[in-house]
Curated annotation (Swiss-Prot):
<dbReference type="InterPro" id="IPR036047">
    <property type="entry name" value="F-box-like_dom_sf"/>
</dbReference>
<dbReference type="InterPro" id="IPR053781">
    <property type="entry name" value="F-box_AtFBL13-like"/>
</dbReference>
<dbReference type="InterPro" id="IPR032675">
    <property type="entry name" value="LRR_dom_sf"/>
</dbReference>
<dbReference type="InterPro" id="IPR006566">
    <property type="entry name" value="FBD"/>
</dbReference>
<feature type="domain" description="F-box">
    <location>
        <begin position="1"/>
        <end position="47"/>
    </location>
</feature>
<dbReference type="Pfam" id="PF24758">
    <property type="entry name" value="LRR_At5g56370"/>
</dbReference>
<feature type="domain" description="FBD">
    <location>
        <begin position="340"/>
        <end position="388"/>
    </location>
</feature>
<protein>
    <recommendedName>
        <fullName>Putative FBD-associated F-box protein At5g56700</fullName>
    </recommendedName>
</protein>
<dbReference type="InterPro" id="IPR055411">
    <property type="entry name" value="LRR_FXL15/At3g58940/PEG3-like"/>
</dbReference>
<dbReference type="InterPro" id="IPR050232">
    <property type="entry name" value="FBL13/AtMIF1-like"/>
</dbReference>
<dbReference type="Pfam" id="PF00646">
    <property type="entry name" value="F-box"/>
</dbReference>
<dbReference type="InterPro" id="IPR001810">
    <property type="entry name" value="F-box_dom"/>
</dbReference>
<dbReference type="Pfam" id="PF08387">
    <property type="entry name" value="FBD"/>
</dbReference>
Length: 398
């Protein structure tokens, strides 16, 4: 039987690549053959926590990363907790990674003694395909000389921007960027947000309620997937048409028309609406979703039926409807629910001609819900499958 020591170094490095970096490094004490094998690994990850262990790890990286033997670093990740990673160390290691043609770089700073700006060489790295930056101590300070010709995936979550122009400048020089994710915080130094990326195919935005309400400009003509989670009570969007859009995932407190009127081309829509006490529970007339085939609608309000009937009327080719009602107490005291029994003269076209799959989750058997189900089953002529899921814990006035 062959011994593991008889295997080639190339195969042993392949085996080590399936281990976390810490475990892979620990094999260096097995024998002379194993001593430096880990230094050929192309994927490295280092986690810092408080205490002497982090100091040892810093010394280890400072000594060994400059001597790393892999000609290309496929993936490099640094994650720091409790101020254990020093800014000057991180800058030095990123420079080394750039010199080794790093393809994916992930930096997560949950807490450090000072904000860390990344070296200017990172912003002209020709090999970089994926960049992920997390944490309020990461400072995005983009130099005037910036060009990332290979960058396709960019994630910017809860970090700081040196000024209003940093994000716009960075995006302007990523000619093949396809996937962009931005999670904002109130401390990030941005007021407006401008995303003008002709090549972008996926865009995800998360905006907490305490962020600024200045204008958001989105120009992404190649976009196929759009996700926005916006908890602000006031919002302003300027969105150019997205003719290639296939899917949208929207979570808003109110005013869904601010987004819906600009993204009507999708085939699949998932939307969660949480209305407040001052909002009418519909969007404006004139918005039609001719391409919409799959709708997942979650309404966190007792006044759910008015929005639902409008979606049904404005989606003439709808094939799949997933409805989740997770209501709070009715926010509109004079709200008049849809009278499903008396709504015979204007049956939505999708019920008569296209709806095939229907699911209702959160059902508790109110008179309005029973009338709605009777309406669906009476008029949905093409229906092939349906399911009604109860949710006992759902709030309904108790």
């Amino acid at each position: 039987m062959a011994k593991i020591s008889d295997l080639s170094d190339e195969l042993l490095v392949k085996i080590l690549s399936f281990l976390p970096t810490k475990e892979a490094v620990s094999t260096s004490c097995l024998s002379k053959q194993w001593e430096f094998l880990w230094m050929w690994l192309s994927k490295l990850e280092f986690y810092f926590s408080d205490g002497s262990e982090s100091a040892c790890l810093r010394d280890f990286i400072a000594k060994n990363l400059p001597l790393h033997k892999a000609p290309i670093i496929e993936s490099l990740r640094f994650c720091s907790f409790f101020g254990s990673l020093q800014p000057k160390d991180l800058k030095s290691w990123v420079r080394i990674a750039v010199s080794r043609c790093v393809r994916e770089l992930s930096i997560s700073l949950h807490d450090t003694t000072a904000a860390v700006s990344l070296p200017s060489s990172l912003y002209t790295c020709k090999s970089l395909v994926t960049l992920k930056l997390y944490g309020k101590k990461v400072l995005l300070d983009v130099p005037r000389t910036v060009f990332l010709p290979s960058l396709k995936t960019l994630q910017l979550e809860r970090l700081r921007y040196s000024d209003e122009d940093s994000l716009r400048l960075l995006l302007s020089y990523c000619p093949v960027l396809e996937d962009l994710s931005i999670v904002r915080e109130d401390y990030d130094n941005l007021r407006a947000l401008v995303v003008i990326v002709p090549s972008l195919q996926r865009l995800s935005l998360e905006i907490p309620g305490n962020c600024s309400s200045d204008g958001y400009v989105i120009v992404t003509p190649s976009l196929k997937y759009f996700k926005v989670v916006d908890y602000r009570e006031s919002m302003s969007y300027l969105i150019e048409q997205m003719p290639e859009l296939e899917e949208a995932d929207i979570v808003v407190l109110q005013y869904p028309e601010k987004l819906l009127e600009s993204v009507t081309f999708f085939k699949r829509l998932s939307i969660r609406v949480i209305f407040n006490t001052y909002t009418e529970t519909v969007y404006r007339d004139g918005i039609v979703f001719n391409r919409l085939e799959n709708l997942k609608l979650c309404i966190c309000n007792g006044d759910w039926s008015k929005l639902l009937i409008q979606f049904l009327k404005d989606s003439p080719n709808l094939r799949v409807l997933n409805l989740l009602v997770d209501d709070y107490p009715s926010s509109l005291g004079d709200y008049e629910p849809v009278r499903w029994k008396n709504n015979k003269s204007s049956v939505p076209k999708c019920l008569l001609e296209s709806l095939e799959t229907f699911e209702f989750a959160g059902y508790i058997g109110t008179p309005e819900e029973r009338d709605f189900l009777s309406y669906i089953f009476k008029h949905a002529r093409c229906l092939k499958s349906s399911s009604i899921l109860s949710r006992p814990e759902r709030y309904h006035g108790i």
